[in-house]
Amino acid sequence: MILIALLAILIVGGLVAWVAERWHPLWPRFISLLALGCNFLVLLALWLWQPDPFMINGQGAWLITLDRPWIPHFGVRFHLALDGLSLLLALLTCFLGLMAVVASWTEIKYRIGFFHFNLLWVLAGVLGVFMALDLFLFFVFWEVMLVPMYFLIAIWGHEHRHPASFKFFIFTHSGGLLLLIAILELAWTHHQNTGELTFSYLDLLGASPDPETAFWIMLGFFIAFTIKLPAVPLHSWLPDAHTQAPTGGSVILAGVLLKTGAYGLLRFVVPLFPVAAAEFAPVAMLMGVMGILYGAVLAFAQQDVKRLIAYSSISHMGFVLLGVFAWNAVALQGAVIQMLAHGISAGALFMIAGALQERLHTRNMRRMGGLWAQAPRIAAISLFFAVAALGLPGLGNFMGEFLVLLGTYRASVPFAAAGALGLILAVVYALIIVQKTLHGEPEEQRHFTDFSTKDMVAMGTMILILFWLGLYPQPVFDMAHPALEGLQQLTME
Amino acid sequence: MSSLDFTALLPLILITLASLTLTLIVAGYRQHRLTMVATLIALVLCLAVIPLAAAVSPQHVPPLFIIDRYALFYMGLIFTAALAITLLAYGYMKGLVDQPEEFYVLLLLASLGAAILAASNHFASLFLGLEILSVSLFALLAYPRRFQLSLEAGVKYLILSSASSALLLFGMALIYAETGALGFGQLSTLLSTGALSSEIFFLAGLALIMTGLGFKLSWVPFHLWAADVYQGAPAPVTAFLATVSKGAVFALLLRLFVQVDGPQHHTLIVLLSFIAVATILAGNLLALLQNNIKRILAYSSIAHLGYLLVALLASGNLGVEAVTFYWVAYFIMNLGAFGVVTVLSSPTQEKENLEDYRGLFWHRPGLAGIFTFMLLSLAGIPLTVGFIGKFYIFAAGVEATLWLLLFTFVMGSILGLFYYLRIIIALYQTPTIEKEALASPSSLPLMGSLTLALLTLLLIWWGVYPDPLMRIIQAVAMALI
């Protein structure tokens, strides 16, 4: 029931927030904070109440499951479950949700209730994606979260919001349709082999279609997830969507939505089609490396801060793709840490970019300059997250990238070497942000408020998390370990 | 005819009597509200006797009709749709200066034609049903007779209908020449015993019949009339045309297809596959170019007929279920979408340009929300009945391994998303101040709004929990095969 409650809190919270706008514009914001905070605490409690919270183990590593029939005619079940991996991502989702509400506190000025409704529903969809163990249910959550995200960009976005929201929806929906056909073909192959029609992840793990079919189905899954990730030839929706989305939307997009693609690769593509995925791994890893380098090079060329962060996200998610397809214990742990650390650091960077845009009414870095003098708090925090993004040892991003490269090195030396180049390019673009925005002479004498206490609390928490991930990531390893090991075992057989 | 036959035919008999009675009422006493209420009562009565007829089904009424679960299901769908259109049209027809009463008589007659199609098991009843439906539709289309566009739509439909009737008759003649049979059942036995000497005439006849029906269903390349007629027709009639008339013809087509064992005729399958691909692509591509909501919805409905053809070609149990489920979804979505247009329009001022809908969310959030749901459902986004319908067709297609058609379907859905999103975005754009002033907060017709709310509820209910509907449809599909 806890799993249903997690979804219900967000869904009902969204509706209440929408209605509550009538009374006072602050109501929706508080309701969202309450709903997300409540979810966050429930998840945290769920984790800490395990017999041995830092070493989750047991059969299949499922902490909690819920399984009910839904559409018996097609063998579809309402099957949700959490293991260490899902729990980590669910925690990230709720945490960044809180951050997104804080980031939109002053930015969103009209239709506040509807904004928070959409925000909470996106997060409900994402939570569902992380928890669904029935492929049909997974697909439903996968598609449902697009609609509120689309509204977030299309209604509250910046100047070119309409084309950007179109692109976002069309790209991800196209991937979704491929995914749907792939899921159906998988289920039907299973049906032909066993006579049982089911969409259950656990049943389909043993579906074993013939190699050629498996390859095509795998490709359908892979394309859908790499569009969302995004991997390089399929990435072109991302810079526009990120740039045009309101700050809260960008935080959710970069921090959480991209992770659903990575999660799909990790949870579905490799375990469901171990052989096909192993054959395909070189191509996938090549795409990962291309993403790392391409994203970093293009980030370097941007003038718009949000675009820069968006391209850097492509680069960072390339590491995740690389790690997933290297498919050994080290690389997988690295991919998970990278997902969490990138969620936090990109979220924070977008919040800073949003704060700057709100104050300066521009995202052009050429016109920023000299923030150190005018807003020391914003400047110091920007510096921190910029160096976090470039992979400074001791911070979470470094830990993720390092482990991914270490694991990749075992799988393929050339890919590891090429991926490592990305670390150098990251330094270039991160230092460019610092140089252009923080240093130098201000273009004009501006007066604007620095970060408030509320912002500082949010930022401070994120800084602490990055330190934690960088200095003492063991609890996270322990938490993800059984799930990752379980996934790996599936591919051994 | 035995009493069982009468029981089985009750829905048809009742609706015939109802249209006659209504004519007499209108002749004696003209009163808009009274006529409308009488229509509602008639339709509810027709719906109420369907369970009675179902109790004796399947019942052959030789030689013309077969009353089985399949026929009764579609009749239920047709009468419910007519009911919804009556409720939606009431507010709209009030705006008509002269004599709105006959509209309801024609609506009942058209429903009678559609119901006959759903139950017909013989070429003669097919033709009769189709003509009753079409002739009432000419009049309905041109009902606001002072408006040029409506008249034009009526005339266009008249010419198209005569052409398609001619083709249909010629096709029937060819089949009769070859087999000597006009009943679907006879045809099916002749075909299964292999009594046919040469298939040429039979196939040519079948192709001509498909063409004739294809005009009514607006398959590409027989679609050219659709957008003009949809645009010109009064909004509630457009809703009727898009749903009831097409649904009934498709129901008949499916029955014919199953009876003559369509999948066995390779040429026919190839032909229909081409038509499906062309219909999906052309419908969606042409919709992209429109700025008129009615035209966009017209082309989108062409595309949806293409999707339905994919399910028809998949055939088998799952194919028939998919077709039937998709029709339910299609009825809800299109009644809803055209319903929104209807409640905002009046005969003198049809709200059909995309411009008219810009910023609707800001002054009519409820209506914009309903429209958004309808459009998302048309686009096949989950938690709407449209998604389950699409899923059904995908499932049938995957089972029958129709990869080419499925990929066309995917392409079509992606293209479709462009124009559905275009409308949605227009709904949520912030209106300019002058626009705000123009959008006078005139009250919406109550009954129309309630109907729309109910449709939205069904759309979500069956989108989230489709199991009860699926069970019914399984039984329906079983009856046909």
From Swiss-Prot, chain B:
Q: Give the top-level enzyme category.
A: translocase
Q: Which residues cross the membrane?
A: 6-26, 36-56, 71-91, 100-120, 123-143, 157-177, 200-220, 234-254, 268-288, 296-316, 323-343, 368-388, 401-421, 444-464
Q: Which reaction does it catalyse?
A: a quinone + NADH + 5 H(+)(in) = a quinol + NAD(+) + 4 H(+)(out)
Q: Does the keyword Hydrolase apply?
A: no
InterPro entries attached to this UniProt entry: NADH-Q_OxRdtase_suN/2, ND/Mrp_TM
Q: What's the protein name?
A: NADH-quinone oxidoreductase subunit N 1
Instruction: For this UniProt record, give its keywords in alphabetical order, as a comma-separated list.
Output: Cell inner membrane, Cell membrane, Membrane, NAD, Quinone, Translocase, Transmembrane, Transmembrane helix, Transport, Ubiquinone
Q: Family per UniProt?
A: Belongs to the complex I subunit 2 family.
EC number, UniProt record: 7.1.1.-
GO MF annotation terms: NADH dehydrogenase (ubiquinone) activity; NADH:ubiquinone reductase (non-electrogenic) activity; quinone binding
Can you say where in the cell this protein is located? Cell inner membrane
Membrane-topology annotation of the record: Multi-pass membrane protein
What this protein is reported to do is described as: NDH-1 shuttles electrons from NADH, via FMN and iron-sulfur (Fe-S) centers, to quinones in the respiratory chain. The immediate electron acceptor for the enzyme in this species is believed to be ubiquinone. Couples the redox reaction to proton translocation (for every two electrons transferred, four hydrogen ions are translocated across the cytoplasmic membrane), and thus conserves the redox energy in a proton gradient.
Oligomer and partners: NDH-1 is composed of 14 different subunits. Subunits NuoA, H, J, K, L, M, N constitute the membrane sector of the complex.
Per the record, the GO terms for biological process are: ATP synthesis coupled electron transport
Q: Name one GO cellular component term.
A: plasma membrane
